[in-house]
UniProtKB/Swiss-Prot annotation:
Its main location: cytoplasm. HAMAP family: GlmU. Acetyl-CoA binds at N391, Y392, A428. NCBIfam families: glmU, PRK14352.1. This is Bifunctional protein GlmU. Mg(2+) binds at D109, N233. Binds 1 Mg(2+) ion per subunit. It comes from Bifidobacterium longum (strain DJO10A). The lineage of its organism: Bacteria, Bacillati, Actinomycetota, Actinomycetes, Bifidobacteriales. Homotrimer. The active site is at H368. One of its GO terms (biological process) is cell morphogenesis. Catalyzes the last two sequential reactions in the de novo biosynthetic pathway for UDP-N-acetylglucosamine (UDP-GlcNAc). The C-terminal domain catalyzes the transfer of acetyl group from acetyl coenzyme A to glucosamine-1-phosphate (GlcN-1-P) to produce N-acetylglucosamine-1-phosphate (GlcNAc-1-P), which is converted into UDP-GlcNAc by the transfer of uridine 5-monophosphate (from uridine 5-triphosphate), a reaction catalyzed by the N-terminal domain. It is an enzyme of class 2 (transferase).
Length: 460
């Protein structure tokens, strides 16, 4: 099964999204609509992958190139319609000598369009000897979709858009999904005769099927799962499709041995991995390339972004970005871990702790009310509440190193850059500005002054 070219239509604005950015750049389960469709199309390994752009063309083109540097960008002119988009694409590809064989055409507003459905569509097209094949589906409510009109023998006659359909045509439940396979020669001939004499005043690609009948057989392949070809036109549809899909994702993980107490409030993106016997509690969001190990507990009300949580760890009511949580380590509640943290095993970051680029050793605990940034903490060290590593001098971030076996008193301030050795004890309220050797106790001599008979200003 060789595809000469794949054309992804991404030129539209998507006005019903009411957005300042193109519809194709909205996110679904962690990826843009455009990238999700490009993902599925790329699996078929077409000789050429082209993306047609128009509205905010540079922005969409940049998104496409960030996915695939070799993608061919086609700029659609101001003549509207999907038919015109394909005319522009075929003209550019033909001039470059990049098209001779089956051509896949797909809209970019179907975030669940999958490679398996596309593979079966192309196989059906080739096996049937069709000049053109349209991917269809059956909907209980086909409102808004182009209807597939067949003859008495079941052959595809044409596709009628919603605004151009008569009463009997509107009753048809088989609809066009805006995904097609054409033989290049048939497509070239079919799009040459497109006209804009319709309610929208656009060049419809659907009209090309009628012309294609004269050049080759036209067929239809029904998508096995209607969800894979469901389009998104507004944010209401986006929310509904996201919820349906997320429920499927949660069910898949539950069948694979993961406990999810409330799938309705648990959101898991596609690239997340979860180990057996892990538990995900309500209100949790697992995003990006997050990995949750076996027997780990996440939640409730926790967000993990590109984070690895090893086996047996617990992350409760916290937000964690680009960090690694070691085995049996406890995070939370109300902990904020910014990017770059590395926790050993059996460690702890407790309530109202913020960390950034911190290396926390095995068994080391930062129980509460502390900021640890650009710091290395050894093994089995305890950090008292209210401790701050002052890492920023106004220009540069500086590092704090605290060794193993240390006991840091409450309310300590470490003015970086500073190094503290192993087995060091610091007194409460200490300000540590200079290096401290191992096996040392350090404290700041802050003199307490009592002013007797004092009255606050408002009582004087």
């Amino acid at each position: 099964m060789a595809l000469s070219a794949a054309i992804v239509l991404a030129a539209g604005e998507g006005t019903r999204m009411r957005s300042n950015k193109p519809k194709v750049l909205h996110a679904f389960a962690g990826k843009t609509f455009l990238n999700r469709v490009m993902d599925s199309v790329a699996v078929l390994n077409p000789d050429t992958l082209a993306v047609v752009v128009h509205f905010q063309a540079e922005r969409v083109a940049e998104a496409a190139r960030s996915y695939d540097e070799q993608v061919t960008i086609v700029n659609q002119d101001d003549i509207p319609g999907t038919g015109r988009a394909v005319q522009c694409a075929m003209a550019q590809l033909t001039e470059a000598g990049k098209v001779d064989g089956p051509v896949l055409i797909a809209a970019s507003d179907m975030p669940l369009l999958d490679s398996e459905t596309l593979h079966r569509l192309v196989e059906f097209h080739t096996a049937s000897g069709n000049g053109a094949t349209v991917l269809t589906t059956i909907l209980d409510d086909p409102t808004g979709y182009g209807r597939i009109i067949r003859d008495r023998e079941g052959n595809v006659l044409r596709i009628v858009e919603q605004k151009d359909a008569n009463r009997s045509e509107l009753a048809v439940q088989e609809v066009n999904t805006s995904v097609y396979v054409f033989e290049a020669s048939v497509l070239t001939e079919a799009i040459a005769g497109l006209k804009s004499n319709n309610a929208q005043g656009e060049f419809y690609l659907t009209d090309a099927l009628e012309t294609a009948k004269a050049a080759g057989k036209v067929g239809a392949f029904a998508a096995p799962d209607p969800l894979t070809v469901e389009g998104v036109n507004d944010r209401v549809q986006l929310a509904a499709l996201s919820k349906t899909y997320n429920r499927r994702v949660c069910e898949r993980w539950m069948r694979d041995g993961v406990t999810i107490l409330d799938p309705e409030t648990t959101w898991i993106e596609d690239d997340v991995q979860i180990g057996r016997d892990a538990t995900i509690l309500p209100g949790s969001f697992l995003q990006g390339h997050t990995v949750v190990g076996e027997d780990a507990i996440v939640g409730p009300y926790t967000t993990l972004i590109d984070t690895t949580v090893d086996e047996g760890a617990v992350v409760e009511r916290s937000r964690v970005q680009e960090s690694h949580i070691g085995a049996r380590t406890n995070i939370g509640p109300w902990t904020y871990l910014r990017p770059g943290n590395e926790f050993g095993e059996d460690a702890k970051a407790g309530a109202f702790v913020e960390m950034k680029k911190a290396h926390i050793g095995n068994g080391t605990k930062v129980p509460h009310l502390s900021y640890v940034g650009d710091a290395q903490l050894g093994d089995h060290t305890n950090i008292g509440g209210g401790t701050i590593t002052a890492n920023y001098d106004g220009v540069h971030k500086n590092s704090t190193t605290i060794g193993s076996g240390c006991h840091v008193g409450a309310g300590n301030l470490f003015v970086a850059p500073v190094e503290v050795g192993n087995n060091v004890t610091t007194g409460a309220g200490s300000v540590v500005r200079h290096a401290v050797p191992s096996d040392t106790m350090v404290y700041s001599e802050n003199t307490q002054h009592n002013v007797e008979g004092w009255k606050p200003a408002w009582e004087r």
